[in-house]
Amino acid sequence: MDVVMKLNNIFSGLPKKKKSKVLGRGIGCGKGKTSGRGHKGQKARSGVSINGFEGGQQSIFTRLPKRGFNSLPKNKYSIINVSLIQRLIDSGKIDNVSAITKEVLYNLGVISSVKQKIKILGDGKLNTTVCIEYDFISKSAKSQVTLLNSLSDSESK
């Protein structure tokens, strides 16, 4: 017997995707009336999902102990060495006569914001006396700099 291929006997194999069941179209369809949700109750209503609720059983995140802690955010400040200030004076970008404020340092691109706190460290050597605004200062830098302080000396670190 010779089988002739015709359009009516082409078989493409099993269906790739199972068709979804139509819900709520009468009791004869098998998923009518309550549409597989059971009778009444919170889960039968719309917008049901209760996160972390396990049917009255103590939920997993209350069963497990608390772990660790959240540390407070660090005070971020820019560190400026005395050698950098001397380099800026030598290059002529800063004159040592007027006070060096946060605005001056911001305009030169030394700090990223005028509101940022500044800590001056004593790495390097200053050849001239300088009046500078700061928030924190090290002892070695304090001996080299004439201070225009934004905090009192008792608060400096």
From Swiss-Prot:
UniProt-listed SUPFAM superfamilies: Ribosomal proteins L15p and L18e
Example of a GO biological process term: translation
Any one Gene Ontology cellular component term annotated for this protein: large ribosomal subunit
Gene Ontology molecular-function annotations: rRNA binding; structural constituent of ribosome
This protein's record includes keyword RNA-binding: yes
Gene3D superfamilies in the cross-refs: 3.100.10.10
Stored InterPro entries: Ribosomal_uL15 (IPR030878), Ribosomal_uL15/eL18 (IPR021131), Ribosomal_uL15/eL18_sf (IPR036227), Ribosomal_uL15_bac-type (IPR005749)
Keyword Ribosomal protein found: yes
Keywords: Ribonucleoprotein, Ribosomal protein, RNA-binding, rRNA-binding
Family membership noted in the UniProt record: Belongs to the universal ribosomal protein uL15 family.
Subunit structure: Part of the 50S ribosomal subunit.
Role of this protein: Binds to the 23S rRNA.
Name this polypeptide is given: Large ribosomal subunit protein uL15
